Amino acid sequence: MNIKLDYSDVSFRKDGKLKLLIIVGTRPEIIRLAAVIKKCRKYFDCLLAHTGQNYDYNLNGIFFRDLGLEDPDVYMDAVGDDLGETVGNIINCSYKLMSACKPDAMLVLGDTNSCLSAIAAKRLHIPIFHMEAGNRCKDECLPEETNRRIVDIISDVNLAYSEHARKYLHECGLPKERVYVTGSPMAEVLHSNLPQIEASDVHERLGLEKGKYILLSAHREENIDTEKNFLSLFNAINAMAEKYDMPILYSCHPRSRNRLEKSGFVLDKRVIRNEPLGFHDYNCLQMNAFAVVSDSGTLPEESSFFTSVGHPFPAVCIRTSTERPEALDKACFVLAGIDEKSLLQAVDTAVQMNLDGDYGIPVPDYVEENVSTKVVKIIQSYTGVVDKMVWRKF
Protein backbone atom coordinates (compact mmCIF):
# COMPACT_ATOMS: atom_id res chain seq x y z
CA MET A 1 0.00 0.00 0.00
CA ASN A 2 1.47 3.37 -1.06
CA ILE A 3 0.70 5.66 1.87
CA LYS A 4 0.84 9.38 1.10
CA LEU A 5 3.10 11.02 3.67
CA ASP A 6 4.27 14.15 1.85
CA TYR A 7 1.74 16.94 2.34
CA SER A 8 4.13 19.82 1.64
CA ASP A 9 1.96 20.92 -1.28
CA VAL A 10 -1.22 21.08 0.82
CA SER A 11 -2.12 24.54 2.08
CA PHE A 12 -5.01 26.77 3.01
CA ARG A 13 -5.95 29.81 0.93
CA LYS A 14 -4.69 32.14 3.66
CA ASP A 15 -7.52 34.59 3.06
CA GLY A 16 -7.73 35.72 6.68
CA LYS A 17 -10.55 33.35 7.63
CA LEU A 18 -10.35 30.66 10.28
CA LYS A 19 -8.47 27.66 8.87
CA LEU A 20 -10.55 24.53 9.45
CA LEU A 21 -9.57 20.95 8.64
CA ILE A 22 -12.44 18.45 8.33
CA ILE A 23 -11.50 14.76 8.28
CA VAL A 24 -13.81 12.00 7.02
CA GLY A 25 -13.34 8.39 5.97
CA THR A 26 -16.70 6.66 5.62
CA ARG A 27 -20.04 6.99 3.87
CA PRO A 28 -22.06 7.94 7.00
CA GLU A 29 -19.65 10.76 7.83
CA ILE A 30 -19.92 12.19 4.32
CA ILE A 31 -23.72 12.05 4.39
CA ARG A 32 -24.18 13.57 7.84
CA LEU A 33 -21.57 16.28 7.26
CA ALA A 34 -22.75 17.29 3.78
CA ALA A 35 -24.54 20.50 4.80
CA VAL A 36 -21.89 21.31 7.41
CA ILE A 37 -19.07 20.93 4.87
CA LYS A 38 -20.82 23.29 2.45
CA LYS A 39 -21.40 25.88 5.19
CA CYS A 40 -17.82 25.60 6.46
CA ARG A 41 -16.43 26.02 2.94
CA LYS A 42 -18.47 29.22 2.65
CA TYR A 43 -17.42 30.86 5.91
CA PHE A 44 -14.02 29.34 6.71
CA ASP A 45 -10.78 28.64 4.90
CA CYS A 46 -11.63 24.95 4.80
CA LEU A 47 -9.77 21.79 3.77
CA LEU A 48 -11.52 18.42 3.52
CA ALA A 49 -9.35 15.33 4.00
CA HIS A 50 -10.41 11.71 3.37
CA THR A 51 -8.53 8.95 5.18
CA GLY A 52 -9.51 6.27 2.66
CA GLN A 53 -11.15 4.11 5.35
CA ASN A 54 -13.95 3.21 2.91
CA TYR A 55 -12.24 3.04 -0.46
CA ASP A 56 -15.08 1.65 -2.58
CA TYR A 57 -16.65 4.18 -4.99
CA ASN A 58 -20.14 2.92 -4.17
CA LEU A 59 -19.50 3.62 -0.49
CA ASN A 60 -17.96 7.06 -0.97
CA GLY A 61 -17.57 8.59 -4.41
CA ILE A 62 -21.20 8.27 -5.38
CA PHE A 63 -22.24 10.24 -2.30
CA PHE A 64 -20.02 13.22 -3.13
CA ARG A 65 -21.82 13.34 -6.48
CA ASP A 66 -25.33 12.84 -5.09
CA LEU A 67 -24.87 15.41 -2.33
CA GLY A 68 -23.27 18.05 -4.55
CA LEU A 69 -19.97 18.04 -2.66
CA GLU A 70 -16.58 18.90 -4.07
CA ASP A 71 -14.02 16.11 -3.97
CA PRO A 72 -11.76 16.01 -0.91
CA ASP A 73 -8.73 18.27 -1.02
CA VAL A 74 -6.57 15.48 0.40
CA TYR A 75 -6.84 11.69 0.07
CA MET A 76 -4.62 9.89 2.59
CA ASP A 77 -5.00 6.30 1.35
CA ALA A 78 -4.42 5.19 4.95
CA VAL A 79 -6.01 1.72 4.82
CA GLY A 80 -3.55 -0.96 5.95
CA ASP A 81 -3.53 -4.75 5.86
CA ASP A 82 -5.21 -5.00 9.27
CA LEU A 83 -6.92 -2.85 11.88
CA GLY A 84 -3.74 -1.98 13.74
CA GLU A 85 -1.98 -0.80 10.60
CA THR A 86 -5.01 1.19 9.45
CA VAL A 87 -5.43 3.02 12.77
CA GLY A 88 -1.71 3.72 12.90
CA ASN A 89 -1.74 5.04 9.34
CA ILE A 90 -4.73 7.29 10.05
CA ILE A 91 -3.02 8.88 13.04
CA ASN A 92 0.34 9.12 11.26
CA CYS A 93 -1.06 10.58 8.04
CA SER A 94 -3.23 13.04 9.98
CA TYR A 95 -0.24 14.15 12.04
CA LYS A 96 1.85 14.72 8.91
CA LEU A 97 -0.99 16.61 7.22
CA MET A 98 -1.69 18.88 10.20
CA SER A 99 2.01 19.56 10.71
CA ALA A 100 2.22 20.68 7.08
CA CYS A 101 -0.94 22.77 6.71
CA LYS A 102 -1.29 24.02 10.33
CA PRO A 103 -5.07 24.35 10.73
CA ASP A 104 -6.57 26.62 13.38
CA ALA A 105 -9.10 23.90 14.26
CA MET A 106 -10.25 20.44 13.17
CA LEU A 107 -13.73 18.91 12.94
CA VAL A 108 -14.67 15.24 13.04
CA LEU A 109 -18.02 13.49 13.29
CA GLY A 110 -18.96 10.22 14.90
CA ASP A 111 -17.10 7.15 16.05
CA THR A 112 -15.20 5.70 13.10
CA ASN A 113 -11.52 4.85 13.01
CA SER A 114 -11.03 8.00 10.94
CA CYS A 115 -12.11 10.06 13.95
CA LEU A 116 -9.00 8.85 15.74
CA SER A 117 -7.20 11.48 13.66
CA ALA A 118 -8.18 13.66 16.62
CA ILE A 119 -5.29 12.06 18.54
CA ALA A 120 -2.86 13.74 16.15
CA ALA A 121 -4.62 17.08 16.57
CA LYS A 122 -4.41 16.79 20.35
CA ARG A 123 -0.65 16.23 20.28
CA LEU A 124 -0.27 19.24 17.97
CA HIS A 125 -2.40 21.49 20.21
CA ILE A 126 -5.06 22.01 17.54
CA PRO A 127 -8.59 22.66 18.90
CA ILE A 128 -10.85 19.65 18.24
CA PHE A 129 -14.59 19.92 17.58
CA HIS A 130 -16.48 16.62 17.68
CA MET A 131 -19.99 16.22 16.26
CA GLU A 132 -22.21 13.29 17.31
CA ALA A 133 -20.46 13.38 20.68
CA GLY A 134 -21.82 11.54 23.70
CA ASN A 135 -23.57 8.72 21.85
CA ARG A 136 -23.43 5.55 23.95
CA CYS A 137 -25.03 2.13 23.51
CA LYS A 138 -23.26 0.60 26.54
CA ASP A 139 -22.27 -2.46 24.48
CA GLU A 140 -18.57 -3.24 24.71
CA CYS A 141 -18.76 -5.58 21.70
CA LEU A 142 -19.04 -2.56 19.42
CA PRO A 143 -15.65 -1.18 18.33
CA GLU A 144 -17.33 2.20 17.90
CA GLU A 145 -17.97 2.39 21.63
CA THR A 146 -14.22 2.52 22.29
CA ASN A 147 -13.70 5.18 19.63
CA ARG A 148 -16.52 7.28 21.11
CA ARG A 149 -14.92 7.37 24.52
CA ILE A 150 -11.50 8.27 23.15
CA VAL A 151 -12.67 11.06 20.86
CA ASP A 152 -15.17 12.52 23.34
CA ILE A 153 -12.55 12.74 26.07
CA ILE A 154 -9.80 14.36 24.00
CA SER A 155 -12.06 16.79 22.10
CA ASP A 156 -12.10 20.40 23.23
CA VAL A 157 -15.73 21.06 22.28
CA ASN A 158 -18.28 18.27 21.99
CA LEU A 159 -21.37 18.79 19.84
CA ALA A 160 -24.09 16.37 20.93
CA TYR A 161 -27.28 15.45 19.12
CA SER A 162 -29.53 15.22 22.19
CA GLU A 163 -29.89 15.74 25.93
CA HIS A 164 -29.30 12.01 26.38
CA ALA A 165 -25.88 12.43 24.78
CA ARG A 166 -25.14 15.56 26.82
CA LYS A 167 -25.93 13.59 29.98
CA TYR A 168 -23.48 10.83 29.02
CA LEU A 169 -20.77 13.42 28.42
CA HIS A 170 -21.39 14.98 31.83
CA GLU A 171 -21.15 11.51 33.41
CA CYS A 172 -17.68 11.24 31.84
CA GLY A 173 -16.67 14.36 33.75
CA LEU A 174 -16.49 16.68 30.76
CA PRO A 175 -17.05 20.37 31.58
CA LYS A 176 -20.58 21.51 30.75
CA GLU A 177 -19.35 24.74 29.19
CA ARG A 178 -17.65 22.70 26.43
CA VAL A 179 -20.72 20.64 25.48
CA TYR A 180 -23.47 21.89 23.16
CA VAL A 181 -26.61 20.18 21.88
CA THR A 182 -26.85 20.99 18.17
CA GLY A 183 -29.30 18.30 17.06
CA SER A 184 -28.65 15.86 14.23
CA PRO A 185 -27.41 17.25 10.90
CA MET A 186 -29.39 14.63 8.93
CA ALA A 187 -32.63 16.61 8.59
CA GLU A 188 -30.81 19.49 6.90
CA VAL A 189 -29.24 17.08 4.42
CA LEU A 190 -32.43 15.11 3.78
CA HIS A 191 -34.63 18.19 3.41
CA SER A 192 -32.34 19.82 0.86
CA ASN A 193 -32.31 16.56 -1.14
CA LEU A 194 -35.99 15.66 -0.75
CA PRO A 195 -37.03 16.68 -4.30
CA GLN A 196 -34.34 14.41 -5.80
CA ILE A 197 -35.26 11.60 -3.40
CA GLU A 198 -38.93 11.78 -4.35
CA ALA A 199 -38.06 11.97 -8.07
CA SER A 200 -35.78 8.90 -8.08
CA ASP A 201 -36.72 6.23 -10.63
CA VAL A 202 -34.99 3.48 -8.65
CA HIS A 203 -38.14 1.34 -8.45
CA GLU A 204 -38.41 1.19 -12.22
CA ARG A 205 -34.72 0.45 -12.61
CA LEU A 206 -34.80 -2.38 -10.09
CA GLY A 207 -38.23 -3.73 -11.05
CA LEU A 208 -39.73 -3.20 -7.59
CA GLU A 209 -43.32 -2.30 -6.73
CA LYS A 210 -43.78 0.35 -4.07
CA GLY A 211 -44.91 -1.13 -0.77
CA LYS A 212 -44.19 -4.68 -1.96
CA TYR A 213 -40.56 -5.19 -0.90
CA ILE A 214 -38.43 -5.15 2.24
CA LEU A 215 -35.29 -3.01 2.23
CA LEU A 216 -32.39 -4.63 4.09
CA SER A 217 -29.05 -3.26 5.23
CA ALA A 218 -26.82 -5.44 7.41
CA HIS A 219 -23.15 -4.57 7.62
CA ARG A 220 -22.07 -3.88 11.21
CA GLU A 221 -18.96 -5.65 12.43
CA GLU A 222 -20.70 -7.29 15.38
CA ASN A 223 -23.41 -8.72 13.09
CA ILE A 224 -21.16 -9.87 10.25
CA ASP A 225 -17.79 -10.85 11.71
CA THR A 226 -19.04 -12.78 14.76
CA GLU A 227 -19.99 -16.29 13.59
CA LYS A 228 -22.86 -16.83 16.05
CA ASN A 229 -24.44 -13.46 15.29
CA PHE A 230 -23.94 -13.85 11.55
CA LEU A 231 -25.74 -17.20 11.41
CA SER A 232 -28.52 -16.05 13.72
CA LEU A 233 -29.17 -12.91 11.69
CA PHE A 234 -29.08 -14.46 8.23
CA ASN A 235 -31.20 -17.43 9.23
CA ALA A 236 -33.70 -14.87 10.52
CA ILE A 237 -33.50 -12.99 7.20
CA ASN A 238 -34.26 -16.19 5.28
CA ALA A 239 -37.22 -16.81 7.60
CA MET A 240 -38.42 -13.26 6.91
CA ALA A 241 -38.26 -13.89 3.16
CA GLU A 242 -40.29 -17.07 3.53
CA LYS A 243 -42.91 -15.49 5.79
CA TYR A 244 -43.59 -12.34 3.76
CA ASP A 245 -42.95 -13.86 0.32
CA MET A 246 -41.77 -10.63 -1.27
CA PRO A 247 -38.45 -9.35 -2.59
CA ILE A 248 -35.92 -8.37 0.05
CA LEU A 249 -33.52 -5.88 -1.51
CA TYR A 250 -30.22 -6.21 0.31
CA SER A 251 -27.93 -3.19 0.00
CA CYS A 252 -24.81 -5.30 0.44
CA HIS A 253 -21.59 -3.67 1.65
CA PRO A 254 -18.18 -5.18 0.83
CA ARG A 255 -17.78 -6.54 4.38
CA SER A 256 -21.09 -8.41 4.10
CA ARG A 257 -20.47 -9.59 0.54
CA ASN A 258 -17.07 -11.00 1.43
CA ARG A 259 -18.42 -12.71 4.55
CA LEU A 260 -21.29 -14.34 2.66
CA GLU A 261 -18.99 -15.58 -0.08
CA LYS A 262 -16.43 -16.92 2.38
CA SER A 263 -19.03 -18.69 4.54
CA GLY A 264 -20.97 -20.21 1.64
CA PHE A 265 -24.23 -19.22 3.34
CA VAL A 266 -27.17 -19.66 0.97
CA LEU A 267 -29.63 -16.79 0.98
CA ASP A 268 -33.28 -17.35 0.14
CA LYS A 269 -33.89 -16.67 -3.56
CA ARG A 270 -36.15 -13.74 -2.63
CA VAL A 271 -33.18 -11.95 -1.03
CA ILE A 272 -31.66 -9.84 -3.81
CA ARG A 273 -28.09 -8.76 -3.20
CA ASN A 274 -27.42 -5.32 -4.66
CA GLU A 275 -24.42 -3.04 -4.70
CA PRO A 276 -24.66 -0.22 -2.13
CA LEU A 277 -27.11 2.36 -3.44
CA GLY A 278 -26.75 6.10 -3.90
CA PHE A 279 -28.19 8.55 -1.39
CA HIS A 280 -31.29 9.53 -3.36
CA ASP A 281 -32.11 5.99 -4.47
CA TYR A 282 -31.69 4.45 -1.03
CA ASN A 283 -33.89 7.01 0.70
CA CYS A 284 -36.55 6.72 -2.00
CA LEU A 285 -36.57 2.97 -1.39
CA GLN A 286 -36.82 3.53 2.35
CA MET A 287 -39.86 5.76 2.26
CA ASN A 288 -41.75 3.39 -0.07
CA ALA A 289 -40.82 0.05 1.53
CA PHE A 290 -43.13 -2.48 3.18
CA ALA A 291 -40.51 -2.36 5.94
CA VAL A 292 -36.92 -1.23 6.39
CA VAL A 293 -34.75 -3.70 8.29
CA SER A 294 -31.34 -2.23 9.02
CA ASP A 295 -28.44 -2.09 11.45
CA SER A 296 -27.49 1.40 10.25
CA GLY A 297 -26.96 4.05 12.89
CA THR A 298 -28.84 6.61 10.81
CA LEU A 299 -32.08 4.57 10.65
CA PRO A 300 -33.71 6.30 13.67
CA GLU A 301 -32.83 9.73 12.28
CA GLU A 302 -34.14 8.90 8.80
CA SER A 303 -37.34 7.40 10.21
CA SER A 304 -37.93 10.50 12.33
CA PHE A 305 -37.34 12.85 9.39
CA PHE A 306 -39.54 11.00 6.91
CA THR A 307 -42.33 10.84 9.47
CA SER A 308 -42.06 14.62 9.86
CA VAL A 309 -42.51 15.17 6.10
CA GLY A 310 -45.38 12.73 5.61
CA HIS A 311 -43.46 9.67 4.41
CA PRO A 312 -43.42 7.36 7.45
CA PHE A 313 -42.10 3.83 7.02
CA PRO A 314 -41.86 0.83 9.38
CA ALA A 315 -38.30 1.00 10.74
CA VAL A 316 -36.81 -2.12 12.32
CA CYS A 317 -33.29 -2.02 13.76
CA ILE A 318 -31.45 -5.37 13.76
CA ARG A 319 -29.34 -4.69 16.81
CA THR A 320 -29.55 -5.46 20.52
CA SER A 321 -28.62 -1.95 21.68
CA THR A 322 -28.91 1.64 20.48
CA GLU A 323 -26.97 4.85 20.99
CA ARG A 324 -30.07 6.86 20.06
CA PRO A 325 -32.48 6.32 22.98
CA GLU A 326 -34.17 9.62 22.18
CA ALA A 327 -35.62 7.95 19.06
CA LEU A 328 -37.07 5.14 21.15
CA ASP A 329 -38.46 7.80 23.50
CA LYS A 330 -40.53 9.03 20.54
CA ALA A 331 -41.30 5.54 19.08
CA CYS A 332 -39.52 6.22 15.78
CA PHE A 333 -38.30 2.64 15.36
CA VAL A 334 -38.38 -0.86 16.80
CA LEU A 335 -35.28 -2.53 18.22
CA ALA A 336 -35.49 -6.10 16.95
CA GLY A 337 -32.41 -8.05 17.94
CA ILE A 338 -30.97 -10.60 15.51
CA ASP A 339 -32.80 -13.86 16.21
CA GLU A 340 -35.67 -15.19 14.09
CA LYS A 341 -38.48 -14.88 16.63
CA SER A 342 -37.61 -11.34 17.70
CA LEU A 343 -37.07 -10.11 14.14
CA LEU A 344 -40.35 -11.47 12.77
CA GLN A 345 -42.30 -10.12 15.74
CA ALA A 346 -40.66 -6.71 15.36
CA VAL A 347 -41.45 -6.50 11.63
CA ASP A 348 -45.07 -7.53 12.27
CA THR A 349 -45.44 -4.90 14.97
CA ALA A 350 -43.80 -2.09 13.00
CA VAL A 351 -45.78 -2.82 9.82
CA GLN A 352 -49.15 -3.09 11.57
CA MET A 353 -48.60 0.09 13.58
CA ASN A 354 -47.66 1.92 10.39
CA LEU A 355 -50.85 0.66 8.70
CA ASP A 356 -52.82 1.90 11.71
CA GLY A 357 -51.27 5.36 11.41
CA ASP A 358 -49.46 4.92 14.72
CA TYR A 359 -46.16 6.34 13.53
CA GLY A 360 -44.56 7.70 16.64
CA ILE A 361 -43.44 11.31 16.92
CA PRO A 362 -40.47 12.94 15.17
CA VAL A 363 -37.57 13.57 17.54
CA PRO A 364 -37.25 17.37 17.94
CA ASP A 365 -33.45 17.13 17.83
CA TYR A 366 -33.71 15.17 14.57
CA VAL A 367 -35.70 17.76 12.63
CA GLU A 368 -33.44 20.76 13.27
CA GLU A 369 -32.54 22.40 9.97
CA ASN A 370 -29.92 24.93 11.05
CA VAL A 371 -27.34 22.56 12.52
CA SER A 372 -24.68 23.70 10.05
CA THR A 373 -25.17 27.30 11.20
CA LYS A 374 -24.75 26.26 14.83
CA VAL A 375 -21.58 24.34 14.05
CA VAL A 376 -19.97 27.24 12.18
CA LYS A 377 -20.73 29.71 14.96
CA ILE A 378 -19.54 27.37 17.73
CA ILE A 379 -16.25 26.69 15.92
CA GLN A 380 -15.73 30.41 15.32
CA SER A 381 -16.59 31.19 18.95
CA TYR A 382 -14.46 28.58 20.69
CA THR A 383 -11.29 28.14 18.63
CA GLY A 384 -9.68 31.18 20.23
CA VAL A 385 -10.98 30.23 23.67
CA VAL A 386 -9.35 26.79 23.45
CA ASP A 387 -6.11 28.29 22.17
CA LYS A 388 -6.00 30.67 25.14
CA MET A 389 -7.45 28.61 28.00
CA VAL A 390 -6.20 25.12 27.12
CA TRP A 391 -2.99 25.61 25.16
CA ARG A 392 -2.04 29.09 26.47
CA LYS A 393 -1.04 30.21 23.00
CA PHE A 394 -1.59 33.86 23.96
Residue ranges and their predicted role:
Residues 1-246, 256-394:
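Nucleotide-activated sugar donor-binding and catalytic core shared by glycosyltransferases
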